[in-house]
Amino acid sequence: DTLSLHDALPIYYCTLIALHKPPFFEEKHRIVWREIEQVKEISEIKHPVVRAVMDHMNIQRGLEIFYQGDLPARTGLGSSSSFTVGFLNAMYALRGQMSTKEQLAAEAVYIEREVLKESVGVQDQIAASFGGLNRINIHPDGNFDVHPLTISPIRSNELKSHLMLFYTGVARNASEVAEDKIKKIPGKKAELTEMQKMVDSAT
């Protein structure tokens, strides 16, 4: 199993608004992000996650989608997976359906890895779906267990007061970074074993 300790800190946000679009317009869908897209078909959408999720969920009605994020892309803080999870959740909400955290995480992984063919891990999608401080066990078959860690507000504030976060301005592609990490795993077994022990001692 792969173990990791994750804390989804409520510092930065991505805001998604999804509405059904009246059927009176020539363009069926309008997506506002870095670009403003107005298209007739899902296949014409440039935003890869929006296109993949709408196709995956077989969206029939026209949509207006507005996205605003506190972070630029490719910061390494999980903003892409947060968007995927949030957009899936919004699509279910438009259907009047509730989705479980497990389902959101699994579908986000499927969209990013199987549909978009990105070489990414699964921790970010799980962290975005569950939120909070968790011990995540990822099994060889791809299934996972999430164990929330309950700590007092005093201990939580103490932990956060000892963390520092810096923006370097360096953009990186998560898929490329993951590919490089996978190649180096055979030579890093001792370090990875030690890191796994740290998760055990922390939880």
What do the predicted segments below correspond to?
Residues 62-64:
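Residues at or immediately flanking beta-strands
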Residues 71-75:
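Short pre-catalytic strand/loop immediately N-terminal to key active-site residues, enriched for Gly-Thr
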Residues 6, 13-59, 68, 91-94, ...:
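C-terminal nucleotide
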Residues 77-97:
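DPxDG-like acidic metal-binding loop motif
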